[in-house]
């Protein structure tokens, strides 16, 4: 009897583990296989070969034929006497200076009130001069309503991020603008910090030292986060996240 109970308990535990794995996804299985190990660095790969990659398509001006001066020592876009050292073609590297200091303070207040009263009277209701239970057929309907609304809201946010990251030119648009993407991973003990920068850069905004400020990147996508033990502790459990979405209260 004890063996049957033990086997039944083991089957129940296995079923619960399977249900938990299905509820939390395949990521839980991967995390279980990495218990006691540091987060692994992702392999360096070509961003254009990733699943879901789509080349950037933007409105372009009409192409203009290039003009050449045969007796000139300079060429268009040159910033040095011999050669322009800035990134200008696919595969080149430039440094993105990420300097974000955002501060927002928003306050809203709304007040509404409305009062409504309606009286309806009938002098003759199908020849009936007096309705049973009333003094007459006059005031048949009287309605009144009062509504009021008072709402207040405020948002206070302050963010700061200062760092540098090298980005690679992944695409050259027909008008000369560059599509750049950079990723940086820093592992400290059992926590991995990730920084991703992507966007469209105008070659004229690249400084002589081959750097560009993040504020001059169009369609900028900047993400800074992490993964590891500290991030796992800060995130609520999968079951709690599901209950937060489903419970209406």
Swiss-Prot record:
A lipid is attached at residue 26 (S-diacylglycerol cysteine). It is a lipid-anchor. One of its GO terms (cellular component) is cell outer membrane. A lipid is attached at residue 26 (N-palmitoyl cysteine). GO terms for biological process: bacterial-type flagellum-dependent cell motility. It holds the Pfam family FlgH. Keywords: Bacterial flagellum, Cell outer membrane, Lipoprotein, Membrane, Palmitate, Signal. It is found in: Cell outer membrane; Bacterial flagellum basal body. One of its GO terms (molecular function) is cytoskeletal motor activity. Transmembrane segments: none annotated. Residues 1-25 form the signal peptide. HAMAP family: FlgH. Assembles around the rod to form the L-ring and probably protects the motor/basal body from shearing forces during rotation. Belongs to the FlgH family. PANTHER family: FLAGELLAR L-RING PROTEIN. The basal body constitutes a major portion of the flagellar organelle and consists of four rings (L,P,S, and M) mounted on a central rod. NCBIfam families: PRK00249.1-5 (NF001305). This is Flagellar L-ring protein. It comes from Afipia carboxidovorans (strain ATCC 49405 / DSM 1227 / KCTC 32145 / OM5).
């Amino acid at each position: 009897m004890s063996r049957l109970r033990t086997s039944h308990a083991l089957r129940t535990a296995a079923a619960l583990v399977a249900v938990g794995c299905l509820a939390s996804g395949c990521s839980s299985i991967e995390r279980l296989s990495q218990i006691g190990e540091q987060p692994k660095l992702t392999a360096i790969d070509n961003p254009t070969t990733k699943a879901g990659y789509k080349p950037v398509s933007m409105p372009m001006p009409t192409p203009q034929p290039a003009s050449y001066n045969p007796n000139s020592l300079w060429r268009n876009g040159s910033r040095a006497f011999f050669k322009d050292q800035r990134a200008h073609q696919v595969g080149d590297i430039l440094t993105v200076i990420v300097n974000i200091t955002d501060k927002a303070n928003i306050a809203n207040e709304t007040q509404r009130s409305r009062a409504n009263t309606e009286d309806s009277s009938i002098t003759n209701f199908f020849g009936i001069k007096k309705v049973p239970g009333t003094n007459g057929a006059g005031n048949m309907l009287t309605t009144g309503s009062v509504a009021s609304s008072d709402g207040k809201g405020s948002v206070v946010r302050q963010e700061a991020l200062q760092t540098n990251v090298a980005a690679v030119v992944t695409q050259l648009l027909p008008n000369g603008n560059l599509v750049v993407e950079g990723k940086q991973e820093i592992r400290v003990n059992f926590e991995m910090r990730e920084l991703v920068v992507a966007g469209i850069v105008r070659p004229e905004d690249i400084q002589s030292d081959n750097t560009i400020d993040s504020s001059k990147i169009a369609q900028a996508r900047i993400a800074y986060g992490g993964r590891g033990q500290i991030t796992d502790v800060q995130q609520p459990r999968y079951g709690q996240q599901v209950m937060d979405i489903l419970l209406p209260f």
